[in-house]
Amino acid sequence: MARTKLYMRIVAQRVTHASVTIDGKVKSKIGLGMLVLLGIEEADNEEDIEWLCQKLTKLRIFSDENDAMNLDVNQVEGSFLVVSQFTLHALTKKGNRPSFIRAARPEQAIPLYEQFLKRLAEVSGREVQSGEFGTMMAVELLNDGPVTIIMDSKNRE
């Protein structure tokens, strides 16, 4: 049986503000910037992290003075809020209950998640806030546009 190809997956949303609340307390929040939902798959590695961090930092999804998406997160002095989300790797081909078998197990995913946060801060030079890995969170955001971009680390188009 052929294996479905899934890799580190990101959903990046341009936001005017976003926050993560855990047990009724705000853990982290940002103003203008990007909310990044990060799904880590079993085949992911440091190369995937590097490519995605470089891409996110240079992604021109913010409006310039002519309302054209022409500016990156640095040019608008924005921030990142990164939230781990294994459900981005849901397999829904069979039945009605999603399978998450391809999502990386916590012992592999946590170090990669932490490395992603560190590397994104290094590459971007911007503030990087985060959710809490493996915890039920309430994520609140005001999607600006809306602008929502999906990227897979092995599908580098």
Regions found by a protein language model. Name each.
Residues 65-80, 129-141:
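Glycine/charge-rich, flexible interdomain linkers and switch-proximal surface loops
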Residues 13, 39, 84, 140, ...:
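Short beta-strand segments
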Residues 25-77, 87-118, 123:
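Compact, glycine-rich, soluble single-domain proteins
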Residues 1-7:
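N-terminal amphipathic/basic-hydrophobic helices that include classical n-h-c signal peptides
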Residues 52, 83, 147:
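Residue-level signal for inorganic ion chemistry
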Residues 100-157:
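Positively charged, low-complexity, intrinsically disordered RNA-binding extensions
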